[in-house]
Amino acid sequence: MLTKITFFERFEQDILSGAKTITLRDEAESHVFAGQILPVSTFEDDRWFCDIEVIEVVPVLFSELTEQHAAQENMTLPELRRVIQEIYPGLEQLFQIRFCLVQ
């Protein structure tokens, strides 16, 4: 089970503003549960910047990503597909972690 989660620094402001409300992860990073509070740090330097509460975790296929997923990531669908392919090249099975910022 994950006890913290990291994001690339480029997503920090989107998370803090509430514009980014989901993250797509591989199976290794999907072991969280609804109601769990996770400290959030930057991937680059492990700097804590907030806490999030997990709302739900659902499997989703890369080929089934939609404009709604992209909007929840604060991206266009082509941007989202490109970013996912950079992070998880060739991976079809993803897990959507929906979250909210803990104030």
From Swiss-Prot:
Keywords recorded for this protein, A-Z: Hydrolase
Similarity-based family: Belongs to the N(4)-acetylcytidine amidohydrolase family.
Gene Ontology annotations for the cellular component aspect, listed alphabetically: cytosol
Gene3D superfamilies reported in the protein's UniProt record: Hypothetical protein
Catalytic activity: N(4)-acetylcytidine + H2O = cytidine + acetate + H(+); N(4)-acetyl-2'-deoxycytidine + H2O = 2'-deoxycytidine + acetate + H(+); N(4)-acetylcytosine + H2O = cytosine + acetate + H(+)
Location of the active site: 20, 23, 73
Source species of the chain: Shewanella sp. (strain MR-4)
EC number: 3.5.1.135
Annotated ASCH domain residues: 6-92
Job of this protein: Catalyzes the hydrolysis of N(4)-acetylcytidine (ac4C).
GO molecular function, one term: N4-acetylcytidine amidohydrolase activity
Principal EC category: hydrolase
Name recorded for this polypeptide: N(4)-acetylcytidine amidohydrolase
